[in-house]
């Protein structure tokens, strides 16, 4: 009797458990990670936006006080430039390995570690006001930014599989608002409350919200499991294969290379950083230095309304080709207008450039969770971020080389023009939205889970 029962039951208890774990990792979205309760959705969306805010406020609070740091620590211009470029370099180098780490320990744990590194680095750099500790702790907090930013997309993919565009847009809003608030409020806060030359105190000021957010994250963030493949015994693996054949085949989804996404989003970042980096020098060279403050302020201010506006329609347009193509066309027109029209029109052109850049950034960071399967999101996100910031770092440098070579100020913006064309071409080559298959994946999850239950009951 026992032998007959054993023959009819293909899985032992241990193997059945292994099989269930495999299903959770094999199917795109795990049912137990979805957030379905409305009030919890609101809380988690707010957490995601706050993570974005703090990932930028800590580093964008530095440029306004950079002259004070340079004066007090005796930095050269090269050292000053390295301090501001270090977060971009770390993002370019660390995002890819961070994606692999997300697969191993899960996105929630990676954001936790990232926020801890960010808060610790932001606070500790205020304690030793010398060059080496400042660079070391900037490196530390930048590593925390890379880990947290890479982990957000896989988390959104797990928690909000049907609202990826909207939630990623909220995260993008947090990033952009963090940039704007830190850049605009750091000096007034320092002068009014901390002391006219108390630049070290601003480090502490921006670290406090990070610590508070870390506590909220540990308390309120839902669970998120690692997505690395699970090794099964041969019996369980054979049974999985048999049952999978009787269930609905996995959804075929569009394939897109990380190189494609990385270069496309890197081109967009190059447009933004290239304009920010060369507006002042260009205007000085053409004897229009008085236009620089307005041009820079408009370029950065245009991002916020564009990002907030995209948020309202993000769920409808996320994953579509035309926003990337349209943004590239607008950028080509704007950079041509910047170079060939009178300087008095500069605010018009930088408004178009800033708004288009924000649109592409908001929709672009939604592409990895839309295009990749559940277990591939972290890796694709990490590779994409690394390539994005590598391209963004190289672009402004290339503009300077061209200026030195040809002795023409306008050629510094040639990389921006090429990046705009690249945005059009690579945007047109994206898979169609219909090929993403998220709805089909959701049905596949339910069918796979149903198969687990039916086989276990046998």
Regions found by a protein language model. Name each.
Residues 372-408, 416:
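A late C-terminal transmembrane helix in Major Facilitator Superfamily
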Residues 137-173:
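Cytoplasmic helix-loop-helix junction between adjacent transmembrane helices
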Residues 320-364:
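C-terminal transmembrane helical hairpin of 12-TM major facilitator-type secondary transporters
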Residues 94-106, 307-319, 403:
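Helix-to-loop junctions at the C-terminal end of transmembrane segments
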Residues 62-63, 256-307:
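Extracytoplasmic gate region of multi-pass secondary transporters
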Residues 162-163, 170-222:
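Helix-loop-helix hairpin linking two adjacent transmembrane segments in secondary transporters
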Residues 93-131:
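Conserved MFS/SLC helix-loop-helix module at the cytosolic interface between two early adjacent transmembrane helices
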Residues 74, 106, 127-132, 161, ...:
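Helix-breaking motifs and short loop linkers at transmembrane-helix boundaries and internal kinks
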């Amino acid at each position: 009797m026992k032998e007959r029962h054993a023959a009819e039951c293909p899985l032992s208890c241990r193997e059945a458990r292994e099989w269930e774990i495999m299903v959770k990792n094999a199917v795109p979205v795990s049912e137990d990670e979805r957030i379905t309760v409305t009030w919890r959705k609101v809380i988690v969306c707010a957490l995601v936006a706050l993570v974005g805010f703090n990932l930028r406020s800590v580093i964008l609070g530095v440029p306004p006080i950079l002259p004070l740091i340079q004066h007090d620590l005796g930095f050269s211009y090269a050292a000053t430039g390295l301090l501001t470029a270090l977060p971009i370099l770390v993002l370019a180098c660390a995002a890819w390995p961070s994606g692999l780490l997300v697969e191993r320990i899960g996105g929630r744990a990676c954001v936790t570690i990232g926020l801890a590194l960010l808060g610790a680095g932001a606070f500790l750099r205020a304690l030793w006001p010398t060059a080496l500790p400042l660079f070391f702790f900037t490196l530390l907090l930048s590593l925390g930014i890379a880990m947290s930013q890479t982990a957000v997309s896989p988390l959104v993919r797990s928690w909000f599989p049907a609202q990826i565009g909207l939630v990623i847009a909220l995260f993008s809003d947090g990033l952009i608002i963090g940039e704007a608030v830190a850049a605009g409020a750091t000096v007034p806060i320092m002068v009014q409350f901390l002391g006219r030359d108390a630049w070290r105190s601003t480090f502490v000021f921006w670290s406090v919200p990070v610590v508070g957010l870390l506590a909220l994250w540990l308390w309120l963030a839902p669970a998120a499991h690692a997505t690395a493949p699970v090794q099964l015994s041969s019996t369980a693996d054979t049974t999985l294969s048999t049952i999978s054949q009787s269930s609905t085949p996995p959804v075929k989804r569009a394939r897109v290379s990380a190189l494609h996404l990385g270069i496309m989003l890197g081109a967009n970042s190059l447009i933004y950083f290239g304009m920010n980096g060369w507006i002042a020098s260009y205007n000085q060279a053409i004897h229009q230095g008085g236009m620089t403050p307005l041009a820079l302020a408009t370029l950065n201010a245009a991002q916020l309304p564009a990002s907030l506006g995209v948020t309202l329609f993000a769920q409808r347009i996320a994953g579509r080709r035309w926003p990337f193509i349209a943004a590239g066309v607008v950028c080509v027109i704007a950079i041509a207008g910047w170079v060939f029209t009178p300087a008095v029109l500069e605010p018009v052109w930088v408004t178009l450039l800033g708004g288009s850049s924000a649109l592409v950034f908001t929709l672009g960071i939604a592409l990895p969770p839309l295009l990749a399967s559940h277990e591939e999101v972290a890796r694709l996100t990490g590779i994409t971020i690394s390539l994005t910031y590598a391209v963004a770092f190289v672009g402004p440098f290339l503009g300077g080389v061209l200026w030195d070579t040809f002795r023409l100020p306008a050629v510094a913006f040639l990389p921006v023009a090429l990046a705009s064309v690249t945005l059009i071409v690579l945007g047109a080559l994206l898979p169609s939205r219909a090929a993403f298959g998220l709805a089909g994946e959701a049905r596949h999850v339910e069918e796979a889970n149903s198969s687990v239950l039916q086989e276990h009951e046998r």
